[in-house]
């Protein structure tokens, strides 16, 4: 649940989601659920010539299992806090 909580804290921020089919979608994070499914608003694709059918899409739902990467705004992410939380959760799972 660590990453779910982390992504919930980024709702309203601009992110780039790269899918396993190499499609990259930029947009505002609207919501995320426990399966890390993502809803984006005000989207645009990074390569509109390759994906012209996506030009008319403004909002989308992305299934968590098709996500390769999520690029986050650097100023919104406290990496030290995230590392500490990941270590704490890993220790709790071992016990």
Swiss-Prot record:
Q: Which InterPro entries match?
A: LSM_dom_sf (IPR010920), Sm (IPR047575), Sm_dom_euk/arc (IPR001163), U6_snRNA_Lsm2 (IPR016654)
**Is Ligase tagged as a keyword?**
no
Q: Which SUPFAM superfamilies match?
A: Sm-like ribonucleoproteins (SSF50182)
> What one GO molecular function would you report for this record?
RNA binding
Q: What is its main location?
A: nucleus
Q: Keyword Transmembrane: yes or no?
A: no
Q: Name one GO cellular component term.
A: cytoplasm
**Function comment:** Plays a role in pre-mRNA splicing as component of the U4/U6-U5 tri-snRNP complex that is involved in spliceosome assembly, and as component of the precatalytic spliceosome (spliceosome B complex). The heptameric LSM2-8 complex binds specifically to the 3'-terminal U-tract of U6 snRNA.
Which residues are recorded as modified (Phosphothreonine)?
A: 79
Q: Which family does it belong to?
A: Belongs to the snRNP Sm proteins family.
- Protein name in the entry: U6 snRNA-associated Sm-like protein LSm2
Enumerate the UniProt keywords alphabetically: mRNA processing, mRNA splicing, Nucleus, Phosphoprotein, Ribonucleoprotein, RNA-binding, Spliceosome
Cell location: Nucleus
- Please report the stretch or stretches of sequence annotated as the Sm domain: 2-76
Quaternary data: Component of the precatalytic spliceosome (spliceosome B complex). Component of the U4/U6-U5 tri-snRNP complex, a building block of the precatalytic spliceosome (spliceosome B complex). The U4/U6-U5 tri-snRNP complex is composed of the U4, U6 and U5 snRNAs and at least PRPF3, PRPF4, PRPF6, PRPF8, PRPF31, SNRNP200, TXNL4A, SNRNP40, SNRPB, SNRPD1, SNRPD2, SNRPD3, SNRPE, SNRPF, SNRPG, DDX23, CD2BP2, PPIH, SNU13, EFTUD2, SART1 and USP39, plus LSM2, LSM3, LSM4, LSM5, LSM6, LSM7 and LSM8.
- The gene it comes from is LSM2
Species per Swiss-Prot/TrEMBL record: Homo sapiens (Human)
Q: Which domain of life is it from?
A: Eukaryota
Fetch the CDD domains from UniProt.
LSm2
One GO biological process this protein is involved in is: mRNA catabolic process
Pfam families xrefs: LSM
């Amino acid at each position: 649940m660590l990453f779910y909580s982390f992504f919930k804290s980024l709702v309203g921020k601009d992110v780039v989601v790269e899918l396993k089919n190499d499609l990259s979608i930029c947009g505002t994070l609207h919501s995320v659920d426990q399966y890390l499914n993502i809803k984006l608003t005000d989207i645009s694709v990074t390569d509109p010539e390759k994906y012209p059918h996506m030009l008319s899409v403004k909002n989308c739902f992305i299934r968590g299992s098709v996500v390769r990467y999520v690029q986050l705004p650097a100023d919104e992410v406290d990496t030290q806090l995230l590392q500490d939380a990941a270590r704490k959760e890993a220790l709790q799972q071992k016990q």
